[in-house]
Curated annotation (Swiss-Prot):
Region Ran-GTP binding, annotated ranges: 334-419
PTM notes: Mono-ADP-ribosylated by PARP16.
Chain ranges of the Importin N-terminal domain: 21-101
Natural source organism: Mus musculus (Mouse)
HEAT repeat start-end pairs: 3-29, 32-62, 85-120, 129-160, 170-201, 212-247, 260-302, 314-359, 363-392, 399-438, 449-485, 500-537, 544-592, 597-639, 644-680, 686-724, 729-777, 785-828, 834-875
Alphabetical GO biological process terms: astral microtubule organization; establishment of mitotic spindle localization; mitotic chromosome movement towards spindle pole; mitotic metaphase chromosome alignment; mitotic spindle assembly; NLS-bearing protein import into nucleus; protein import into nucleus; ribosomal protein import into nucleus
Gene3D superfamilies hit by this protein: Leucine-rich Repeat Variant
Location of this chain's protein in the cell: Cytoplasm; Nucleus envelope
Designated name of the protein: Importin subunit beta-1
Similarity comment: family membership: Belongs to the importin beta family. Importin beta-1 subfamily.
Self-association and partners: Forms a complex with an importin alpha subunit. Interacts with XPO1. Forms a heterodimer with IPO7. The KPNB1/IPO7 heterodimer interacts with H1 histone. Interacts with SNUPN. Interacts with H2A, H2B, H3 and H4 histones. Component of an import snRNP complex composed of KPNB1, SNUPN, SMN1 and ZNF259. Component of a nuclear export receptor complex composed of KPNB1, Ran, SNUPN and XPO1. Interacts with SRY. Interacts with PRKCI/atypical protein kinase C iota. Interacts with KPNA2. Interacts with KPNA7. Interacts with SNAI1 (via zinc fingers) and SNAI2 (via zinc fingers).
Length: 876
């Protein structure tokens, strides 16, 4: 009885009672988990207990078996499997007995069954479960509650378990699901549970979809369910069609004309949002699939082979029916629409964009009449829909087909930036931003640039949602203007460009925008800073005085922000404070890159002092530390060797960054900075190397360090060796052993992420070897004898390159690094290398591949390495 009372108190409004109950349950779970779970399952299984007690008991069981965190979940599953088999059997019997006895929804028992199943089925236990669940659904005497909760359990199992574990059970599971979905099934609750279960099982029913008769049957049942009067069932059935379209596109031709087309078009027209959303989602998915197929077709054509799968061009064929529904849906916007609410109006905009990318030129004639008819409509909803439709078709069609249309529309768009409706202004600003990004020639043409800039500058004072889009338009405009400017042959940046005359005003307005009191709304503050960064980055020489001014403003703001720290009251203040520091650091990086060397020297003391203060005050915030480290990197780039005077003061913070592997982005930034310091300070980095090397080696040996940090560390060894030359000898043995170990790493080749990682790791090993050989060899005509210390490893290094050559997954980057290293080995060790390379014909194939590469680096280095090998051959 005591347990029941305590379970009932887990929903008590009295905080003390609630906490006491939770403490008791936590203690019981720790003291004797098996007994606790058996007791809980008894409470759950007894229909005489209160609903509150049963639900709470189910929740306790479920939470002891599963977790959102995959690592904890795996631990819980192991812990369950370690429990005595009799106790487990008892719990399993009770939770199965509970199915069908609960009068409330959703069923607790179904979640418990699934939790246990996901632990036991992968280790081939509880073989009787699936047959028992199937029997529950197919037995004509089963109650509605029994069928519903059992189908829920099946759905949860399908959702959470690795599909391979259920492959051999897919027929039985499908039988139960289809039984529950049939139109003869009287209960909509059962139908819903079955339709949801089908949605979760689609990944592992491939064998059933491959057989025509079974596929017909599944498709028939799903299509019938889309006509169910119960909205919940209808939505779930449509969700199935959306997913089936992605998984089984190749099989859909039979069903498209007779059924799917009509069902989804009807759904798109529905007044019920959830139904309309699924109809639109279906066609968005068709576009996604057909774009992938178009890419596959062009790759196949390049390689002179037929594609594996071909597109049926459903989207193109349906344009004339889809576009009118989508443009009509665009007029259903909600005036106080919150950005986070997904609704048919937003989905229609996305679907139009996808159709535009997928069908290219073909979409324009279908959308243009709607735009022309409504862009000046007195009803704001239609004006907005017309602008939205216009903005949505800018990517996909041939730019030359769109350009005249856009230039023609420019005066209207400039006018709409002053529209009485904030929604229309917002959409117009977004559309102008897309024009600047995708068709910049239309935006920076002589006729409209001045009025466009005028309306954008005014737009920065509009509501946050409008101003935020204007900031983005400025970013794209600056980039386009910079790329269109004339650059003298010997110069890196243009002397002047089309934004020069308004540059100072734009920068001033953006700085004002970053200071707006409502800057936290719609991401306005960060959009304005990002826009400022783009504009400074893309500025011509005659804008330099304004860049100097901006630099001083940013530095002043950084100092002000650091003084605010003592006034922080709340967590939200702290978040805004950290965000502002990060934005200022990022902006600082951009202005520093533009600043001339002598100016940089004048401000560097103040900049460095601010950054050091920031490191001191934000030891707890990884995000700010990362941004501050990146800002130091930029300062190092700009100052070069002059940075040496700050090293003593900065060294402790570099150490803290290198040790902060818990926030691995910070650690990565610190490792990257070590490389920058080596390039800038050259041999002057020597006094700091012992400490840095020790931290780097500790990180490599620590398995809690995120794997993405390790390749970067290996590559930095090469930078250090290049910087300090012969002084690297004292680290040589340990570094070469580390590289030998890292270059033998193996990964699971079926996991694409791990294949990428392996390439990254190999590229870093090759870069490290290159730095070491070049550093020890010296840059004089005569090779320094220190390099002979690497001689014993040369054969291993070439075997490593040979191994890479034989791995078909190697990237261009790896080929380039390998070729560069071969060339360096030739110049350092001469004819010995030739013999070792001759014995490994795959290396020659790798160099041939490099010489034919589309990337410049691989081509240049492979050609050079081949020449070096040829030189040795001629000498021999």
């Amino acid at each position: 009885m005591e347990l029941i009372t305590i379970l009932e108190k887990t929903v008590s409004p009295d905080r003390l009672e609630l906490e006491a109950a939770q403490k008791f349950l936590e203690r019981a779970a720790v003291e004797n988990l098996p007994t606790f779970l058996v007791e809980l399952s008894r409470v759950l299984a007894n229909p005489g207990n209160s609903q509150v007690a049963r639900v709470a008991a189910g929740l306790q069981i479920k939470n002891s078996l599963t977790s959102k965190d995959p690592d904890i979940k795996a631990q819980y599953q192991q812990r369950w499997l370690a429990i005595d088999a009799n106790a487990r059997r008892e719990v399993k019997n009770y939770v199965l007995q509970t199915l069908g006895t609960e009068t409330y929804r959703p069923s607790s028992a179904s979640q418990c069954v699934a939790g246990i199943a996901c632990a036991e089925i992968p280790v081939s236990q509880w073989p009787e479960l699936i047959p028992q669940l199937v029997a529950n659904v197919t037995n004509p005497n089963s109650t509605e509650h029994m069928k519903e909760s059992t189908l829920e359990a099946i759905g949860y199992i399908c959702q959470d378990i690795d599909p391979e574990q259920l492959q051999d059970k897919s027929n039985e599971i499908l039988t139960a699901i289809i039984q529950g979905m049939r139109k003869e099934e009287p209960s909509n609750n059962v139908k819903l549970a079955a339709t949801n279960a089908l949605l979760n099982s689609l990944e592992f029913t491939k064998a059933n979809f491959d057989k025509e008769s079974e596929r017909h049957f599944i498709m028939q049942v799903v299509c019938e369910a889309t006509q169910c009067p119960d909205t919940r069932v209808r939505v779930a059935a449509l969700q199935n069609l959306v997913k089936i379209m992605s998984l089984y596109y190749q099989y859909m031709e039979t069903y498209m004309g007779p059924a799917l087309f009509a069902i989804t078009i009807e759904a798109m027209k529905s007044d019920i949002d959830e139904v309309a959303l699924q109809g639109i989602e279906f066609w968005s998915n068709v576009c996604d699939e057909e774009m992938d197929l178009a890419i596959e077709a062009s790759e196949a054509a390049e390689q002179g082979r037929p594609p594996e799968h071909t597109s049926k061009f459903y989207a193109k064929g349906a344009l004339q029916y889809l576009v009118p529904i989508l443009t009509q849906t665009l007029t259903k916007q909600d005036e106080n629409d919150d950005d986070d609410d997904w609704n048919p109006c937003k989905a229609a905009g996305v679907c139009l964009m996808l159709l535009s990318t997928c069908c290219e030129d073909d979409i324009v004639p279908h959308v243009l009449p709607f735009i022309k008819e409504h862009i000046k409509n007195p009803d704001w909803r239609y004006r907005d829909a017309a602008v939205m439709a216009f903005g949505s078709i800018l990517e996909g069609p041939e730019p030359n087909q769109l350009k005249p249309l856009v230039i023609q529309a420019m005066p209207t768009l400039i006018e709409l930036m002053k529209d009485p409706s904030v929604v229309v202004r917002d959409t117009t600003a977004w559309t102008v931003g897309r024009i600047c990004e995708l068709l910049p020639e239309a935006a920076i043409n002589d006729v409209y640039l001045a009025p466009l800039l005028q309306c954008l500058i005014e737009g920065l004072s509009a509501e946050p949602r409008v101003a935020s889009n204007v900031c983005w338009a400025f970013s794209s405009l600056a980039e386009a203007a910079y790329e269109a400017a004339d650059v003298a042959d010997d110069q890196e940046e243009p002397a002047t460009y089309c934004l020069s005359s308004s540059f100072e005003l734009i920068v001033q307005k953006l700085l004002e925008t970053t200071d707006r009191p409502d800057g936290h709304q719609n991401n306005l503050r960060s959009s304005a800073y990002e826009s400022l960064m783009e504009i400074v980055k893309n500025s011509a020489k005659d804008c330099y005085p304004a860049v100097q001014k901006t630099t001083l403003v940013i530095m002043e703001r950084l100092q002000q922000v650091l003084q605010m720290e003592s006034h922080i009251q709340s967590t939200s203040d702290r978040i805004q404070f950290n965000d502002l520091q990060s934005l200022l650091c990022a902006t600082l990086q951009n202005v520093l890159r533009k600043v001339q060397h002598q100016d940089a020297l004048q401000i560097s003391d103040v900049v460095m002092a601010s950054l050091l203060r920031m490191f001191q005050s934000t030891a707890g915030s990884g995000g700010v530390q990362e941004d501050a480290l990146m800002a130091v990197s930029t300062l190092v780039e700009v100052l070069g060797g002059e940075f040496l005077k700050y090293m003593e003061a900065f060294k402790p913070f570099l150490g803290i960054g290198l040790k902060n592997y818990a926030e691995y982005q910070v650690c990565l930034a610190a490792v990257g900075l070590v490389g920058d310091l080596c390039r800038a300070l050259q041999s002057n980095i020597l006094p700091f190397c012992d400490e840095v090397m020790q931290l780097l080696l500790e990180n490599l040996g620590n398995e809690n360090v995120h794997r993405s940090v390790k390749p970067q560390i290996l590559s930095v060894f090469g930078d250090i060796a290049l910087a300090i030359g012969g002084e690297f000898k004292k680290y040589l043995e340990v570094v070469l052993n580390t590289l030998q170990q890292a270059s033998q790493a193996q990964v699971d080749k079926s996991d694409f992420d791990m294949v990428d990682y392996l390439n990254e790791l190999r590229e870093s090993c090759l870069e490290a070897y290159t730095g070491i050989v070049q550093g020890l060899k010296g840059d004089q005509e005569n090779v320094h004898p220190d390099v002979m210390l690497v001689q014993p490893r040369v054969e291993f290094i070439l075997s490593f390159i040979d191994h890479i050559a034989g791995d078909e997954d190697h990237t261009d980057g790896v080929v380039a690094c390998a070729a560069g290293l071969i060339g360096d080995l030739c110049t350092a060790f001469g004819k010995d290398v030739l013999k070792l390379v001759e014995a490994r014909p795959m290396i020659h194939e790798l160099l041939t591949e490099g010489r034919r590469s589309k990337t410049n680096k691989a081509k240049t280095l492979a050609t050079w390495a081949t020449k070096e090998l040829r030189k040795l051959k001629n000498q021999a």
